[in-house]
């Protein structure tokens, strides 16, 4: 369970204390599992959470997926109870590959940038500007550059810069 606050805990008006208590309350619940963010009275799947506000107490939203639960008056109200569907044993990773590059595609970006990154990175996250299509500029081909990465055993994944409705 991950939490935080928009205001420091030592201030008179803060969300830190309630977020901390809510996160402990949820983490100790027998139906809690997986990676979750507890913030602003909501429990959000860690894989779906996005910080959308820099000052508001409801800073995080669940993108294209319902909140797992809400915490109100010290009570947890579950909207999703999928603990029984979690069949894999818990596995902890103590080391992570930090040679992953996030590339936000923009109109007119040259696909050769992927060639320049290949020697320095083991993985690539491409953020497209729509439902997941790759730009096509004729003589420089994004698909061919991605093929070079995957042929070299590197991981490439695609996402979207658009917050709602996902990618294809």
Task: Describe each region flagged by the PLM.
Residues 1-168:
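Active-site histidine-anchored catalytic micro-motif
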